[in-house]
């Protein structure tokens, strides 16, 4: 999500003079401030909705369902608080935060959703109560129906496109600006991405001691979630190079000859645009990453390894 937010904000600042941008988020707010400094404003507030993962990176369905019920109980206060702070915004753009469109309705503001999936679609795949009317799904649908426009990215599920066919416009991939890099031909560069959800953390930790024996390959590995023992092994190795921070990991993609990562939308986008060969890992019980892989397979640009 941060990749799209950065690109969108850069475009707004570049093309619209005298525009004041304020971002409402929590976990990734420091990444945005690292990029934009004081060019925009920041409001640190959790948007209530996210997936909950187990230690192995797979989705915890029980806790994720509890999260949705917490969203249902908390969204009214969130909207009231935001109405008090932002009584007259000119435009609300959301990367699929459903209650943002209720805020737009309350403040009589135009709204745009930009994403490749919606939380009502995700909820139906993972948590829907099939035995009775589902209040959470009803409220999610109601929130999204209030959005004025949907900008639909590639790889979006057909159900979402059909559901919002009167409001949507298809757009291309949204990616970061990458610096031009000069690559050495002496060794192959392999980027191993431990993404924000830490899906591959366990796998990478087990693999690191053996990478030093593959001497014709330089490995670039994210280090944020690793202990000092692992970090020391990285420091001592002559062919393993630590990359600290999600932003720097993504900006290492142009340098890579090969990428190993979770099948997340942003990583797929960047490897496709930059034409980088990759191995993508699915997440257990995650309909989003599973769907991404299904779409790539449908386009006949990947093979499946079981």
Locations of the language-model features?
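Short amphipathic alpha-helix
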Residues: 2-13
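Donor-nucleotide binding loops and adjacent catalytic segments primarily
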Residues: 9-10, 176-255
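Conserved nucleotide-sugar phosphate-binding/catalytic loop shared by glycosyltransferases and other
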Residues: 14-72
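An aromatic- and histidine-rich active-site surface loop
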Residues: 29-31, 92-107
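Conserved nucleotide-sugar donor-binding subdomain of glycosyltransferases
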Residues: 57-91, 98-99
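A donor-sugar binding/catalytic signature common to diverse glycosyltransferases
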Residues: 91-96, 113-114, 248-291
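Active-site proximal beta-strand in glycosyltransferases
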Residues: 105-122
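A nucleotide-sugar donor-handling region in carbohydrate enzymes
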Residues: 122-198, 224-226
């Amino acid at each position: 999500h941060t990749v799209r937010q950065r690109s969108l904000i850069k475009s707004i600042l570049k093309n619209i003079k005298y525009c004041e941008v304020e971002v409402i988020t929590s976990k990734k707010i420091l990444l945005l401030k690292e990029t934009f400094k004081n060019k925009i404003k920041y409001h640190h507030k959790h948007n209530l909705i996210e997936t909950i993962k187990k230690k192995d990176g797979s989705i915890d369905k029980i806790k994720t369902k509890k999260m949705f019920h917490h969203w249902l109980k908390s969204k009214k206060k969130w909207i009231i608080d935001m109405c008090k702070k932002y009584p007259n915004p000119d435009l609300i753009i959301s990367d699929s935060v459903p209650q943002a469109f209720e805020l737009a309705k309350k403040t009589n503001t135009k709204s745009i959703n930009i994403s490749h999936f919606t939380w009502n679609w995700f909820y139906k795949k993972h948590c829907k109560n099939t035995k009775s009317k589902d209040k959470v799904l009803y409220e999610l649908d109601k929130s999204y129906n209030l959005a004025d426009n949907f900008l639909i990215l590639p790889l979006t599920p057909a159900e979402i496109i059909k559901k919002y066919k009167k409001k949507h416009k298809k757009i291309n991939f949204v990616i970061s600006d990458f610096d031009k890099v000069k690559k050495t031909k002496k060794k192959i560069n392999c980027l191993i991405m431990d993404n924000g959800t830490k899906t591959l953390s366990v796998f990478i930790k087990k693999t690191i001691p053996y990478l030093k024996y593959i001497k014709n390959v330089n490995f670039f590995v994210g280090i944020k979630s690793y202990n000092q023992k692992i970090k020391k092994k990285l420091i001592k190795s002559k062919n393993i190079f630590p990359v600290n921070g999600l932003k720097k990991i993504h900006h290492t993609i142009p340098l890579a000859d090969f990428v190993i990562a979770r099948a997340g939308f942003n990583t797929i986008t960047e490897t496709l645009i930059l034409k980088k060969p990759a191995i993508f890992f699915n997440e257990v019980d995650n309909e989003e990453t599973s769907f991404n892989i299904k779409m790539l397979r449908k386009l006949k640009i990947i093979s499946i390894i079981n």
